[in-house]
Structure formats: structure tokens, C-alpha cells
């Protein structure tokens, strides 16, 4: 790895990933960190809830599963980490109290895939061609937002949901790196 773990504000260095997994002080990847901050600030209790994370990337899926299951607040969820080879994904998401989708497939998560009152976190962000839009495209998430929002107790929009929180937590990590270096 080229970057020093003490300067790894993205939280991707294996040292930081390992420390995060062991619940030690480390830089946490910005997107999962932002999602946890959303849950904390909106006072969403996830303790004892079943969370399904769709996507097993090192950037979102795996760190998200670790943070959701941590013995902390928010945390203490029972987590199922799914991926492209998961069988019966719909059966899992229909039983989930929390669904975090980090797949990158526009409008993948449909209304019939979630239960009433579920907490839906949409991490996906895809440019979808749209000739009627001035830019020629629209930004779409993994969740069929307009239909799923009717069933969800909490849902993040795309754009404007997880993305701004990712930026905020990246800045938080940057400040933390500076304060450690400056001994503030």
C-alpha cells in the first residue's frame, strides 16, 4: 500500500480496515461512516434489528456490515451480507428491518422486495440516459424510490442522501488526521 495508514482518510488501508473490524480507533470508510452518522442523527435504533447489506465491496458493503453489527450505538444489528451469487435475495430483503443497497444497479430494489416499515439506505448512484433532461441524464439510485418510499419508515434519496454524508465524513476524517498530526 502506498499511503501511510495514519494519512488514509478514505479508510481503505488494510491496517485501518483491520482496526475497524476489531473496533479499534481508525479511519472509517466515508460512505459507511456517513450512513452510521445518518442513523445516529435521526435516532434510528438498529439494535437487534435484521439488516441486509446488498453488495460486498471493500468500500461500502463489508465495512457497512461490520459497523452495523458493532457493539455500539448505532449498532448491534444482525447482519446478512449479500452479493451477486446470493440465492433468494428477495426473501432476505423482505424479512429485513434495514436494507442497505450498494449495488450500482438503477432501481434494483422494488416495492415488493421490502417489508412495511423497513429502513432503506440507498448507496447506489448511476447516470441513466434521459433525453428530456438538460444534461442528457439523471442520477438514479439502487432503490425504486417513488414506490419504495410508500412502504419505508425511513429512506434516503438519490441524489442528496448518502452522497453528502460521504463528503462530510471524508472531511471529518481529514480533520481527524490533521488534529492527530497537529496534536490538537
Describe each PLM feature range.
Residues 18, 24-119, 128, 136-138, ...:
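Glycine-rich phosphate/diphosphate-binding loop of Rossmann-like nucleotide-binding domains
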